[in-house]
Design a protein with these regions (language model features):
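Flexible "arm" and connector segments at domain edges
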Residues: 1-66, 70-114
């Protein structure tokens, strides 16, 4: 499933001859920009999960920005020859070590403050 969408993303860029612009720095910058646009969906409000799900317009905006962040993230993985699933699993393992359940359960503290 991930491989299929990565192929679609790469084809989308290739058809438009955008590969020349897709440097690691440019893609990383785009991830930050799209992440900021995701955050902008919540500017001056702090909705609950159910608030977001029930507000169709807000939910659609959030989905669009999540998609942009994920597309650029998958594109960067592809450009660097990295498997996004392997990268995420490795990071989850590291996070499990940093945030053991016994010390972090119910806590918002950073691992260095546990």
């Amino acid at each position: 499933m991930v491989e299929e969408i990565v192929k679609e993303i790469n084809l989308f860029a290739a058809e438009r001859e955008w590969n020349q612009f897709h440097t690691p720095k440019n893609i990383a910058s785009s991830i930050i920009i799209e992440s900021a646009e995701l955050l902008e969906c919540f500017q001056w409000q702090d909705p609950t999960i159910s608030d977001v799900v029930e507000d169709i317009k807000l939910l659609e905006s959030v989905e669009e920005e999540i998609a942009d962040v994920m597309i650029y993230s998958l594109r960067l993985c592809s450009l660097l020859g990295r498997d996004p699933i392997e990268i995420m699993r490795a990071k989850l393992e590291k996070n499990a070590e940093k945030y053991p359940v016994s010390e972090s359960k119910g806590s918002a503290k950073k691992y260095s403050d546990l």
